Amino acid sequence: HVVYIIKENRTYDQVLGDMPQGNGDTSLVEFGREVTPNHHRLAEDFLLMDNFNCSGILSATGHQWTDEAYVTDYLEKSFGGFTRSYPYNGDDALAYASSGFIWDNVLRHGLTFRDYGEFVKTTVKPEGSEWMDIYNDLQNGTHNVSISAKGSIEQLTPYVCPTYPAFTLRI
């Protein structure tokens, strides 16, 4: 199995700079082992990648680099205004590279995958449910709140975990 985890908007040094196995700057650690024990455990048990650079300078281009290894000319030129959309989550087909996504390559090679959040839209019902509503529903076992997910690109939907919430600050 390959597990591909995307950690956005944090530098290596901010999160894993306190790991002696890596080439980090401990003076830049903001979210060290005490705050991110799961990240540290994954790095210790599997793989620690330091000195790894990403060309994305914001979510819109970062997700394209992460998912396609390429940013289209259209996206680069839209950077200043995003008049059609902000395509960080698959909302603008003009931003897609003709070479396809990482999951297209997986499928071309006869392999399988499961998506837990990338290019996924989450629906929480009842609409307007906030974090405490969701938490209390879970704790009380009342099942009044439902969380569902589907691909923001339709071809991705069969591979999305339908109950795993993508990025949302409500949960």
Give the ranges of each region predicted by the language model.
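N-terminal pro-sequences and low-complexity stem/linker regions of secreted or lumenal proteins
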Residues: 1-171
